[in-house]
């Protein structure tokens, strides 16, 4: 019986988080030019790039800003004044998928549902479990 009560409490606490995540995804998908992919991510080009797009095995250089749905910024390469380089195969699935949709010089908004971001584990103190994340990503180069 005690386990049933604990499970009911846990379910009650997580349902609002999932509802908020769905609301943010649905709202983003309605923005002009936005595309909701089969995985559930929403992609919207802010600035079109030129040239080629990276593949899932590419190493890319980007600038980015990450926020929660309440607008709280949790990370920014712009604030550090330093772009980052990484293999697309080594980041959250939302980035692997979304950055492949970009061309060098482009800038896009990625709205990442929890299952394509950090899921139930969250990330450190700034990204809670089951958080929908919003990234503004600028693709600088493909290595």
Predicted segments, located by residue:
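Cross-family detector of peptidyl-prolyl cis-trans isomerase
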Residues: 2-143
